[in-house]
Amino acid sequence: MARKDRLTNERLNKLFDSPFSLVNYVIKQAKNKIARGDVRSSNVAIEALNFLDLYGIQSEYAERDDRERHLSATGERRREQGFGTSRRKDPSLYNWSDVK
């Protein structure tokens, strides 16, 4: 591994909020590789960090995507049940003097 490619604590701290998020990300990557049948004898943590560094992806984006998927699924269920998340204002409640 060249000096440029070495992973240091500073680089890890920049990529991940905490060591727990790093571990959770690596576990998720390992599960995905096992499910795909792509199991290698190399270190999955190093592969994941190299991938993140190569494409400039940070773990917060993956966590944000998971949250957005969960929220959109929750919103879909509410819409199916008839609970709208948006509140519509009745235009008859306003006078022209209220509009600036």
UniProtKB/Swiss-Prot annotation:
Q: Where is this region: Disordered?
A: 65-100
Question: Biased-composition ranges for Basic and acidic residues?
Answer: 65-91
Q: What family is this protein classified in?
A: Belongs to the chlamydial CPn_0121/CT_031/TC_0300 family.
Recorded protein name is: Uncharacterized protein CT_031
UniProt source species: Chlamydia trachomatis serovar D (strain ATCC VR-885 / DSM 19411 / UW-3/Cx)
